[in-house]
């Protein structure tokens, strides 16, 4: 079940016309957290209607899904890598310190951006401390989107959480 108050706060940094995530259910399996989400993009925030989900919107949806998954994981103590975090830590680090280090997406069939589903999972989350450098959390993730007409997109992203508590 979606934590509506948490979702509202997670999406607060976004302009009203760029809040695409409508609901999210977070689960944990074998110590790894994942989210299953519903999205709606009534109108693209930057381009005339293309009729399909495009790479910019895929990235925005990924960000919103990932922020909610991390916030919910912190709040509920799910998964690994964020055990020492509080929600206050998350809000402080949400925008400046959660970086997408690598992002790739594959478009298999056009996805209708008006109403579609998505999910993401943490494949691995590790704390790293490079010699002479500041510690950070490294996370490998996978995601996918689909619609009722067999539209399909998937991909992977690597995250770096810097200035970690």
UniProtKB/Swiss-Prot annotation:
E.C. number: 4.3.2.11
Coiled-coil residues: none
Gene3D superfamilies: Rv0098, thioesterase-like hot dog domain (3.10.129.30)
Superkingdom of the source species: Bacteria
Keywords on record: Fatty acid metabolism, Lipid metabolism, Lyase
Catalytic activity, reaction form: a (3R)-3-[(carboxymethyl)amino]fatty acid + holo-[ACP] + H(+) = a (2E)-enoyl-[ACP] + glycine + H2O; (3R)-3-[(carboxymethyl)amino]butanoate + holo-[ACP] + H(+) = (2E)-butenoyl-[ACP] + glycine + H2O
A Pfam family that the UniProt record links to this protein: FcoT
Entry GO MF terms: lyase activity
Protein name, entry field: (2E)-enoyl-[ACP] glycyltransferase
């Amino acid at each position: 079940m979606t934590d509506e108050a948490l979702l509202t706060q997670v999406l607060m940094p976004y302009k009203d016309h760029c809040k695409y995530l409508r609901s999210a259910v977070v689960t944990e399996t074998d110590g790894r957290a994942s989210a299953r989400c519903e999205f709606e993009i009534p109108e693209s925030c930057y381009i005339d209607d293309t009729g399909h989900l495009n790479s910019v919107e895929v990235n925005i949806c990924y960000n919103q899904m990932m922020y909610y998954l991390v916030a919910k994981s912190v709040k509920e103590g799910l998964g690994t890598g964020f055990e020492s975090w509080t929600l206050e830590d998350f809000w402080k680090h949400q925008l400046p310190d959660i970086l997408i280090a690598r992002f790739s997406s594959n478009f298999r069939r056009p996805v209708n951006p008006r109403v579609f589903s998505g999910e993401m999972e943490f494949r691995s989350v590790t704390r790293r401390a490079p010699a002479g450098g500041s510690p950070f959390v490294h996370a490998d993730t996978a995601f996918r989107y689909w619609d009722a007409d067999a539209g399909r997109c998937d991909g992977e992203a690597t995250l770096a959480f810097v200035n970690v508590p």
